[in-house]
């Protein structure tokens, strides 16, 4: 019997790791990856950090160039897909070529959620999703330039840190009452706000842009009535899933391709993962997790499901952010207001713990990444703690 053919659509973390996972889990059939980018699939996290700060930055490939040939994975870069061919099982390219598939994994990622008021500025307005975006930003983030960043989420704050380190004058505008409100617990939000302010970043909370005038500098009028002058305007206010191909194929979409716990779409032969995917939970709610690790998890889960293997057990959600000299790692459940702190954040070394009825359900480390392995095990096992154990620095965490 002829082995099935699997096609992967996308050029990022989830797409590359799906190819790797399929081979690692024993798939020996024909395997193709189609991407509209010219590069090998590359790591996205460095785009807001090292790609802006290093003297001679290089894209970091998810897998080395030799891996693709050695593992007999056919890589099609710089191509545009016209249709997925859900009914015919034939992927059609813009150049007219068609490619048969038996199973399909879609990992087309996401674009920056548009902000029409700023998009009208054309090339004077920047977002960050791809390597080309980082290259353009690197050119314009020059010393003494005034930079306005709209959005104080993870990307906005990482860009603020990088621009400040490039000696720009940075202002961040955030509609909410805090920074990183979607991702960080209250004590970490307060720490990051103070950290950026101490670095010279002006952060305007509970505010938004009302009017924009393009001139020698961009003039931005805020809801508060204040007017800002900017050489560079950047925004990051969320994502818009690249789900057009899926919508045209009549897959279930809601700003993302709806998947189940096996990364399967409403078509049993089509799977999706990474930022383009949104999971329908058992209670019917839709949940999206935008992180490097989530892309890897989706790749492993989808590969197992495609091959009819048991699904891997998922670790607690985890992501990291590098801002200035700080490395913050977030693991587990970030909800709740009653967090314990071990150490002193003012020394830039601390761990915040989230206990629920004595059970550790989440944590954030500040320049204490070596503790993440133990914390992950504790969260997975549902380990209980006395609050004094976790906060007493005289008690080594590894002894608990």
UniProtKB/Swiss-Prot annotation:
Pfam families: Pyr_redox_2, Reductase_C. Keywords: Aromatic hydrocarbons catabolism, FAD, Flavoprotein, NAD, Oxidoreductase. One of its GO terms (biological process) is 3-phenylpropionate catabolic process. The keyword NAD applies. One of its GO terms (cellular component) is cytoplasm. Its EC number is 1.18.1.3. FAD binds at residues 5-36. It catalyses: 2 reduced [2Fe-2S]-[ferredoxin] + NAD(+) + H(+) = 2 oxidized [2Fe-2S]-[ferredoxin] + NADH. This dioxygenase system consists of four proteins: the two subunits of the hydroxylase component (HcaE and HcaF), a ferredoxin (HcaC) and a ferredoxin reductase (HcaD). Part of the multicomponent 3-phenylpropionate dioxygenase, that converts 3-phenylpropionic acid (PP) and cinnamic acid (CI) into 3-phenylpropionate-dihydrodiol (PP-dihydrodiol) and cinnamic acid-dihydrodiol (CI-dihydrodiol), respectively. This is 3-phenylpropionate/cinnamic acid dioxygenase ferredoxin--NAD(+) reductase component. It comes from Escherichia coli O157:H7.
């Amino acid at each position: 019997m002829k082995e099935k053919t699997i096609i992967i659509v996308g050029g990022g973390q989830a797409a590359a790791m799906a190819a790797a996972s399929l081979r690692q889990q024993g798939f020996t059939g024909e395997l193709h990856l189609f991407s509209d980018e010219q590069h090998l699939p590359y790591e996205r996290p460095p785009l807001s950090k090292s790609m802006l700060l290093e003297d001679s930055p290089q894209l970091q490939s998810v897998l080395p160039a030799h891996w693709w040939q050695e593992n007999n994975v056919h890589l099609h870069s710089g191509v545009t897909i016209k249709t997925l061919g859900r009914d015919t099982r034939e992927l059609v390219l813009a150049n007219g070529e068609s490619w048969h598939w038996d199973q399909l994994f879609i990992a087309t990622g996401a674009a920056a959620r548009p902000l029409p008021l700023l998009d009208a500025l054309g090339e004077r307005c920047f977002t960050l999703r791809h390597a080309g975006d980082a290259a353009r930003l690197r050119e314009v983030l020059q010393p003494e330039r005034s930079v306005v960043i709209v959005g104080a989420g993870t990307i906005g704050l990482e860009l603020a840190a990088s621009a400040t380190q490039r000696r720009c004058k940075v202002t961040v505008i955030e509609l909410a009452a805090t920074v990183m409100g979607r991702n960080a617990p209250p004590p970490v939000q307060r720490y990051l706000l103070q950290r950026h302010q101490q670095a010279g970043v002006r952060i305007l909370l509970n505010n938004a842009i009302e009017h924009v005038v393009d001139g020698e500098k961009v003039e931005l009028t805020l809801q508060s009535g204040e007017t800002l002058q900017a050489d560079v305007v950047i925004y990051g206010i969320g994502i818009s899933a690249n789900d057009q191909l899926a919508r045209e194929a009549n897959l279930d979409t809601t700003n993302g391709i709806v998947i189940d716990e096996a990364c399967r779409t409403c078509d049993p032969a089509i799977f999706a993962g990474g930022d383009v995917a949104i999971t329908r939970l058992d209670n019917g709610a839709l949940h999206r997790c935008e992180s490097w690790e989530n892309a890897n998890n989706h790749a492993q889960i989808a590969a197992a499901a495609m091959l009819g293997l048991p699904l891997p057990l998922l670790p607690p959600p985890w992501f990291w952010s590098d801002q200035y000299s700080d490395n913050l790692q977030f693991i587990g459940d970030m909800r709740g207001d009653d967090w314990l702190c071990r150490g002193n954040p003012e020394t830039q070394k601390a761990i915040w713990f989230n206990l629920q009825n004595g059970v550790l359900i989440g944590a954030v480390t500040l320049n204490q990444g070596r503790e993440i392995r133990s914390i992950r095990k504790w969260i997975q096992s549902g380990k209980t703690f006395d609050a004094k154990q976790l906060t007493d620095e005289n008690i080594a965490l590894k002894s608990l």
